[in-house]
Swiss-Prot record:
The keyword Phosphoprotein appears for this protein: yes
EC code(s) of this entry: 2.7.10.2
UniProtKB keywords: ATP-binding, Capsule biogenesis/degradation, Exopolysaccharide synthesis, Kinase, Nucleotide-binding, Phosphoprotein, Transferase, Tyrosine-protein kinase
Family: Belongs to the CpsD/CapB family.
Record-given protein name: Tyrosine-protein kinase CpsD
The keyword Signal is assigned to this record: no
Assigned GO CC terms: plasma membrane
UniProt-listed GO biological process terms: capsule polysaccharide biosynthetic process
Pfam assignment, any one: AAA_31
Activity control summary: Dephosphorylated and activated by CpsB.
PTM (free text): Autophosphorylated.
Amino acid sequence: MTRLEIVDSKLRQAKKTEEYFNAIRTNIQFSGKENKILAITSVREGEGKSTTSTSLALSLAQAGFKTLLIDADTRNSVMSGTFKATGTIKGLTNYLSGNADLGDIICETNVPRLMVVPSGKVPPNPTALLQNAYFNKMIEAIKNIFDYIIIDTPPIGLVVDAAIIANACDGFILVTQAGRIKRNYVEKAKEQMEQSGSKFLGIILNKVNESVATYGDYGDYGNYGKRDRKRK
C-alpha cells in the first residue's frame, strides 16, 4: 500500500486550529450516528474547504476513529501540497476510469487511523467520471470499513460535481469565507446541494476576523457553533 506523509508545515497549521475542529467533530458526532460519509464543499475556490476537510479528518483520526479522506476535487486539487508520496501513486480518477483497483488508491499516512485517496490526474471529463457506476461502487465497498469518510469536493458554485458526490453521502457541510461570499450565494449553494438528497449539516464560517463582533449576515443555518472560526 502506498504511503503518504502530511508535511510538517501542514501539521503545525492544523495544530493551531485543533480546538475548533475538535468542536466541529463533536457536533458531527451529536448530529447522528448515521452521518458517517460527509461531503465538504464551498461556493467558490479559495474559501478553505480543502484545509477544512483535512483538518476535520485529522481530528476524527486523532480521536480514535478510522477515517478516510477522499480528494474528489479532481479539477483543481490542492492536497498535493499537503500530502507527499514516497513513490508513484494512483488516485480517484484512475479508479473511476477503470485503470486501478480500489486497493491501489487507498493510501496509508503518517497519522494513525487516517487513510487518504488522492485525486489522481486531472481527467478530461470529471463530471462524467463521477456519474459512472464506479463512484457508488467505491462508497458501497468502503462505507463499512471506516468510521468516517470525509470527501473534499469541488465548489458547488462553479460546477455540479459536489451535488453528484453528495448524492452518495449521508450529509454535507458548506465552508464559506467571511466577508467574501454574499448570503444569497450561500443560500443558493445550500439549495443546490440539498437537491442531491443529502442532509445539510451546517456552515463553517472560515477566515473570520475575530476583532469583528458579529456575523449576522449569514443568518441562522444551525452552523457548528460560534467558535468555528478558522483560517484556510
